[in-house]
Regions:
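Acidic/polar, compositionally biased interaction segments
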Residues: 1-168
Length: 168
């Protein structure tokens, strides 16, 4: 990334419940998630090195519009977690030092989610702590803006928060 930047978070997290999960989302430019050192989600823009060189399994959903992504939301492969914490690595980056955006959502297999008027499930944001009241209000404004202006949506749920484990 010539004039860009890349942020990397690595730590231990515990899922809210055992079972199978998958990530949904999109980023302009780069978004990559690994669980226990195995890539499970690549939600980068079409011209990202992550998408073109790493070959992480990904499915595009153009019928689910998302921000400025012609490919719509991307989904990763299902992964299973138990009671023990797992290592998570999140990479997010921008290549041109201009504006950036991204969204990372998490789906639990078997749960049902409220849907938008165009049929997109409102999967919860991937969170490691529940937002404070002011942050919740800002997220609600963002959700409404997304639904009315640029499509895409999400939910915020206490039941979907992944807990950061000590030692992270």
């Amino acid at each position: 990334m010539e004039n860009g930047w890349l942020a990397w978070y690595s730590g231990q997290v515990k899922a809210p419940k055992t079972g199978r999960y998958r990530f949904w989302g999109y980023a302009d430019n780069n978004l990559l998630v690994a669980i226990d050192r195995k890539p499970v989600f690549e939600g980068s823009r079409y011209d990202s090195h992550f998408q073109n060189e790493l070959k992480v399994p990904r499915k595009n959903h153009p019928f689910l519009p998302c921000l400025n992504a012609r490919a719509g939301f991307a989904s990763g492969k299902w992964f299973k977690v138990g009671d023990a914490p797992v290592r998570i690595d999140l990479l997010f980056g921008e290549t041109s030092m201009t504006m950036t955006s991204g969204i990372l959502l998490i789906e639990y297999q078997g749960d049902s989610y409220e849907k938008t008027y165009w049929g997109q499930p409102k999967w919860p944001l991937f969170l490691t702590e529940f937002p404070q009241e002011k942050q919740l209000a800002e997220l609600d404004e963002l959700r409404i803006h997304m639904e009315e202006k640029i499509k895409g949506s999400f939910s915020v749920s206490r039941d979907s928060v992944w807990q950061v484990s000590s030692g992270s």
